[in-house]
């Protein structure tokens, strides 16, 4: 949404996920009305409400090494990564680098509550982030020596209980009247 409000006129949205009730506390597109809808469709509609002239292409697929061939990043001006899996992130970074397309990757934000602890830096300057550590190790093996990332310097908090719910594995939509 921020990109559309900033005047970016062409966006490709790639995600096979649907809005889940558990997304409402942290994702701007997630509302009670959008639960169950594809995130890319909800985002595209909102972007078109902001800028009716925007060109928005949606892809209901997860970006993985197996689906990467569907995308030619040589025609992209910039890539913003928010993939949840290490394998998807690595494939995206490697393909962006091969296409010489600038990329910024999001690192782990789970169990973090201090918005002032986020910063944009190079992957190799990050600390305390388990995802960044894995990405550093994997990308170093592949010869990637520089990558712009956003990450939090905050140590993750320990959840109060183990009630983490994922709509992929335990959909609670049928249990709740919306």
Locations of the language-model features?
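Conserved S-adenosyl-L-methionine
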Residues: 5-10
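Short amphipathic alpha-helix with an adjacent loop that forms part of the alpha/beta core around
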Residues: 67-74
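Conserved small/polar residues in nucleotide/adenosyl-binding loops
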Residues: 176-178
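E1/E1-like adenylate-forming module used to activate ubiquitin-like modifiers
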Residues: 78, 83-174
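Conserved SAM/SAH-binding loop
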Residues: 60-67
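Glycine-rich phosphate-binding loop and adjoining beta1-alpha1-beta2 segment
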Residues: 15-51
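N-terminal Rossmann-like FAD-binding beta1-loop-alpha1 element of flavoenzymes
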Residues: 1-2
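Hydrophobic/aromatic anchor residues within beta-strands of the central parallel beta-sheet
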Residues: 56-58
